[in-house]
Amino acid sequence: MSVFNKLMRAGEGKILRKLHRIADQVSSIEEDFVNLSDAELRALTDEYKERYADGESLDDLLPEAFATVREAAKRVLGQRHYDVQMMGGVALHLGYVAEMKTGEGKTLVGTLPAYLNALSGKGVHLITVNDYLAERDSELMGRVHKFLGLSVGCIVANMTPAQRREQYGCDITYGTNNEFGFDYLRDNMAWSKDELVQRGHNFAVVDEVDSILVDEARTPLIISGPADQPPSGTADFAKLVTRLTKGEAGNQLKGIEETGDYEVDEKKRTVAIHEAGVAKVEDWLGIDNLYESVNTPLVGYLNNAIKAKELFKKDKDYVVIDGEVMIVDEHTGRILAGRRYNEGMHQAIEAKEGVDIKDENQTLATITLQQNFFRLYDKLSGMTGTAMTEAAEFHQIYKLGVVPIPTNRPMVRADQSDLIYRTEVAKFAAVVDDIAEKHEKGQPILVGTTSVEKSEYLSQQLSKRGVQHEVLNAKQHDREATIVAQAGRKGAVTVATNMAGRGTDIKLGGNPDDLAEAELRQRGLDPVENVEEWAAALPAALETAEQAVKAEFEEVKDLGGLYVLGTERHESRRIDNQLRGRSGRQGDPGESRFYLSLGDDLMRLFKAQMVERVMSMANVPDDVPIENKMVTRAIASAQSQVEQQNFETRKNVLKYDEVLNRQREVIYGERRRVLEGEDLQEQIRHFMDDTIDDYIRQETAEGFAEEWDLDRLWGAFKQLYPVKVTVDELEEAAGDLAGVTAEFIAESVKNDIHEQYEERENTLGSDIMRELEPRWVLSVLDRKWREHLYEMDYLQEGIGLRAMAQKDPLVEYQREGFDMFNAMMEGIKEESVGYLFNLEVQVEQQVEEVPVQDGAERPSLEKEGATAAPQIRAKGLEAPQRPDRLHFSAPTVDGEGGVVEGDFANDEATGDTRSGSADGMTRADAARRRKGGGGRRRKK
């Protein structure tokens, strides 16, 4: 344990004593609530709300509120919160991460802080990893809250904005991390206040907090629209790389020459093309220099094609179903339908597999969900079965302390030491022998594998031995809950990819609810089609199932409980602990063991040679395992290396995103003020003054008044607004040209532009002007922000090369990002003023109001003939349009690795806005280009 971790744990005892004290306080008043009627219990909610409004704090209300929820849960669910669950609830309310072992009832714990914090009326968000858990928890735990008079909502995919607004309006809202994050982004792309769905970020309880805040922290949420051009060279390069051969890196100091056309580093998941490979590619493509700037996109195609060939394996990283490449979550083995890798990687895999290649997308809005979205909450807490291994990270990045909550009953699971074999074949043979032996006596077994491929290989070996079993992987994900629920039955053998079924308890003897449902379905009943018959038959079926489960539970308990067998160590100790944690819930007996081989990914990438030497020295045959402390230490060392590597990556992502986050706060704050109806008159006057100052500064920064090109300056003014004051008038007022100073020009032109603004308002009318101003500002702001994200993307992609010039890439990114942001702000001011004066506006009379479409978003500034708002027509600034496709990119559910994408439902699409100018460049853009900032790069 590191010194930092020891320091972190030093205060644990003090916190636990505090939690114990409060839990005892709740138990001491429990009897006062038992004799209350349902109506009296429900009335307490209003009483607590009044007391909170009168100045009592939530901490003051905590003991009574928790006792109220405990009694309500007893009456509604038949479940009473244990004292340790009370401790967990207090930890969550105080803003800690509560580590609670599997089966300790984390879902029930969430009801306590949710109820207490909902009393403030500001809303509580309970965040889970998938829609299934969000719906299940909101329905089941929602009964307790509804019984106590609180409203409960649930956010799931494909809801309309109106439905989402209603769910967010509830006292307590359940949903997934991605849904909450995307709603925040879409709120900041909204075109009117009516489209906003979220009402603030008060308090969040994150379930499986390690998965959401750690595993997925490297992956940002991205909303994107179609790119201007689809990738054209992907298919050609997929064919081309089949003619290239993999080799090894050279070392000039050791006199080792590089071999092959390219090298692959599996540990870092990178590829590098050798000189020989470059020469071949140049020859085949008929080009002189692959690395010329004009050929930059080709390098990207080539690297992606090699990665697709070497690093992305079919039936492990992805599967091909019905001509479509589908990503497989590396942790759960689930298919992530509709999701796509970004940066052209998915297209490269599609080209490799010979299926249709779909277009790439362009970023419209982005945020790192974990590191910046969750920091929006006034108070954040979380719960998981495995958090202590990442306690330092929770503290350093999120300022969250971790508290290990004691188990309700002592843990009696036996964790056996690892067995290591020389080859994978020998390992799996031993695994099959072990399973067959345990299966013969009837002990339930859960086998964890790391990929679809390995789960199917093991399944074949078990079938050859005649062992009946269930396979749970990406290809059987639709039966997941049923298989997992019955994995604790006598004689059950379940082969699962990693952590599939997280959130579903494996109960010894089986799950009576699922047994009863299966029995009724066998009789031909359906809960949707035969509602009345189902309701009538359910109680009897449930009673029969409960009796059967009770008898089987005792049998399975005597056999030793659930045996968890891991076929490979994961790169994170936490994932291994999660697999082990499936067994030994609530004091049940259980056993776990990991089988390893030198061919396993972790062993191959780290320390395998040392272990091989140990086994060779000991002269160990292939089929004989070793249990060696040195090997166990080597595995622990390899895991900590990977964990540290991943931690550094996450910290690095945060540093870079922090730059963008500050810019995002400025832009989103500005948008929110516009949407909420702030009077823009004063702001637009500032825009005018700043733009005039900028124009004059660019023209008069050098030389004397006689050398200034005032005709060119006035030409720019005329493009901006209908300028009335002339150069001759200024000369006359100043006496001669020498008296015309920059300050004098600025004062005269500002007075003139303000007069023209008032004249424009008199022509159109104040009401119409007030309605058009937010449209002008929002349309320009959105397009400029989108272009800025685009450029920041490319800046970050190439910034690492600055290290070769002895410069800190992060400092360079901050400096250049700041310059780009300032240029964008200047462009926003300039274009907003230009729209104000140059847009043609027609007012149609006898129309009372402008209807706002539900789900309508930003305007299109180019498509004429689009459906116009009935009251005001502004040429080039028409009613909001929806593009055909709008995409999202998010972290994999339950996973750590992939960046994945999919389509939003059309009614949630957000319109695209484009420049109304001929070349799309403002003077601010042009000035930046002259300074060497370059134009906007087009993403290929």
Swiss-Prot record:
Q: Where located?
A: Cell membrane; Cytoplasm
Compositionally biased spans, kind Basic and acidic residues: 855-865
KW Nucleotide-binding (keyword) present: yes
Biased composition range(s): Basic residues: 928-940
Organism, by scientific name, is Streptomyces griseus
Checking InterPro entries in the record gives:
Helicase_ATP-bd (IPR014001), Helicase_C-like (IPR001650), P-loop_NTPase (IPR027417), SecA (IPR000185), SecA_CS (IPR020937), SecA_DEAD (IPR011115), SecA_motor_DEAD (IPR014018), SecA_preprotein_X-link_dom (IPR011130)
Q: Point out the gene that encodes the protein.
A: secA
Q: What is the annotated role of this protein in its UniProt record?
A: Part of the Sec protein translocase complex. Interacts with the SecYEG preprotein conducting channel. Has a central role in coupling the hydrolysis of ATP to the transfer of proteins into and across the cell membrane, serving as an ATP-driven molecular motor driving the stepwise translocation of polypeptide chains across the membrane.
User: What top-tier enzyme class does this entry carry?
Assistant: translocase
Q: How would you describe this protein's topology in the membrane?
A: Peripheral membrane protein
Protein name according to UniProt: Protein translocase subunit SecA
Q: Name one GO molecular function term.
A: protein-exporting ATPase activity
Keywords of this entry:
ATP-binding, Cell membrane, Cytoplasm, Membrane, Nucleotide-binding, Protein transport, Translocase, Translocation, Transport
